[in-house]
Amino acid sequence: MFRGTHRHSLDSKGRMNVPARFRDWLNAHCDGQLVVTIDAQSQKGERCLVAYPLPTWEKVERRIAELPSNNPAARQFQRLFVGQSEELRLDAQARILLSPNLRKFAELDKELVLVGQIDKFEIWDAARWDACQETWLSGADGFACLGDLVL
C-alpha cells in the first residue's frame, strides 16, 4: 500500500502533491478520499501528520470509540487525534490542501517528506525528518528493544 519516502513541496496555498504510487492506490480503493490528522503520540521534536485512506480511518475511529470515556488519557487522545482530523479528497491535480492548523502542528515549511507506513503515510517537514532520521540511525542499540520483532 504505502511504502517508501517521497520528497514534495508545499505550495503557497498549503497544497501538496501526493506521490503517484500513493494516489493510484487512493483512487483505486477509496475514490481519493483520506483523513489527515496530527500524530498525537509524537514526542517533542518529532511532530508530523498522519494520512489514512478513508476506509482505514473508519476502522481506527471504531477502535477509538471503544476507549473508556471515563479514562482521562483516552479522552485527551480522542480530543487531539479525532478533533484535529480533516477529511480530504485528492483534487484533479492529485493534491490535498493541508489546513493552517495541521501545518502549524507539524511546523511544515515548503519542503515535505511523505513516509509510507503500510496502511497510512506520514507527512513531515523535510528538515525535521532529516534530523530525526539521523538521530534514529546514529542510536547505538536503538532497535534492540524490539528483539524478535525485527525482521
From Swiss-Prot:
GO terms for cellular component: cytoplasm; nucleoid. It comes from the Bacteria. It is found in: Cytoplasm, Nucleoid. Residues 5-56, 85-128 form the SpoVT-AbrB domain. One of its GO terms (molecular function) is DNA-binding transcription factor activity. One of its GO terms (biological process) is negative regulation of DNA-templated transcription initiation. Keywords: Cytoplasm, DNA-binding, Repeat, Transcription, Transcription regulation. Its main location: cytoplasm. Gene3D superfamilies: Transcriptional regulator MraZ domain. HAMAP family: MraZ. Belongs to the MraZ family. Forms oligomers. NCBIfam families: division/cell wall cluster transcriptional repressor MraZ. This is Transcriptional regulator MraZ. The lineage of its organism: Bacteria, Pseudomonadati, Pseudomonadota, Acidithiobacillia, Acidithiobacillales. The gene is mraZ.
